[in-house]
A protein has these predicted regions:
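Phosphate/pyrophosphate-binding loops at sites that engage ATP/ADP/AMP, CoA/4′-phosphopantetheine
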Residues: 1-7, 141-157, 223-224
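Short secondary-structure capping/junction motifs at helix and strand boundaries
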Residues: 3-5, 56-64, 109-111
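Short coil-to-beta-strand
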Residues: 8-17, 109-115
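Claisen-condensing/thiolase-fold acyl-transfer catalytic domains that form or cleave C-C bonds
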Residues: 12-16, 22-59, 67, 131, ...
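Short, well-ordered, mixed-charge alpha-helical segments that flank or form enzyme active sites
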Residues: 18-19, 69-74, 119-123, 241-243
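Long, hydrophobic, well-ordered secondary-structure blocks that form the structural core
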Residues: 43, 63-74, 79-80
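Condensing-enzyme catalytic core mediating Claisen C-C bond formation in acyl metabolism
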Residues: 79-144, 148-151, 184-195, 201, ...
């Protein structure tokens, strides 16, 4: 498989004008669609690429995303060189990248469903605590996805949020509890899985476009291939803020996009 086999690339990142995405794609010589949903870009890119394949607009589509700690800190908070004291609720942007090739040929892992999220704003203003701001969006998309796919929480082996981190994931669990839903071991957050918050100096956990993408490729896909998981739901979360809005004391609108992966036993045995 080579770049010449690709019909379209769908990708995004955290930098202004999708700088990293466009610099990467310029060497591929493949039609490219840039997408942005902050840290929910991973699910948006994969979902969009899946739709292009499903609708017959592409035989093979590449979905990719990336993030890097230093430029993200410079753009959304403060340059690392400033040595600004961070709050305990701050997350650590993951330096990483991931890509997935989607096609019509049956594979052991399939994208079963994709749900676009709505923008949710609970009037949170603290840019150093974006996990709390994003939790309501994750809950909203979870409900939408379950309704859209006629599924229940019991149908999934894993339900993973993108990067709510310790504070935001705890808030989501509280919101679920208020609805009578117990967030058991099937629930987790990619920002808590990619780092060990008890041993690494990452404050509240991981974040960034690469957070959910790297966990999906490295851990979720491994579990699906091994047969330890059958259906996994990824709720990638994004805080749609800019420093200009923060300077103006505006609130932080958030969004979550859902991607559901399923193990295909027929493809695994063939």
């Amino acid at each position: 498989f080579s770049c010449s086999d690709l019909d379209v690339c769908v990708g995004g990142d955290l930098m202004n004008q999708l700088l990293t995405t466009h610099y990467f794609a310029r060497d591929l010589h493949v039609p490219t669609l840039g997408v942005y949903a902050a840290c929910a870009t991973s699910s948006l890119a994969i979902g969009t690429a899946s739709l292009l394949v499903q609708q017959g607009m592409a035989a093979h589509a590449l979905a990719f995303t990336s993030s890097h700690n230093a430029p993200a800190e410079r753009q959304f908070r403060f340059p690392n060189e400033y040595a600004v004291q961070k709050k305990d609720t701050t997350t650590t942007t993951v330096s990483g990248a991931g890509s997935i090739v989607l096609g019509r040929t049956p594979q052991p892992i399939a994208v079963r469903a994709f749900t676009l999220g709505r923008i949710v704003d609970w009037h949170h203003q603290n840019a150093s605590d974006m996990g709390i701001a994003m939790a309501p969006a994750a809950l909203d998309t979870l409900h939408a996805h379950l309704a859209q796919t006629n599924s229940t929480i019991d149908d999934y082996d894993w339900i993973l949020t993108g990067d709510l981190s310790k504070a935001g994931f705890g808030f989501l669990c509280d919101l679920l509890s208020q609805e009578g839903i117990h967030a058991d071991s099937r629930f987790n957050d990619c920002g808590l899985m990619i780092y060990d918050v008890s041993r690494q100096p990452v404050f509240c956990g991981g974040s960034g476009c690469a957070c959910s993408m790297c966990v999906s490729i490295a851990e979720v896909f491994s579990q699906l291939r091994a047969g330890r998981k059958k259906r996994v739901l990824i709720l990638a979360t994004g805080a749609l803020l800019s420093m200009m809005a923060i300077y103006q004391k505006d609130t932080i609108p958030c969004i979550a996009h859902a991607i559901e992966y399923q193990r295909r036993d027929d493809a695994c045995s063939s």
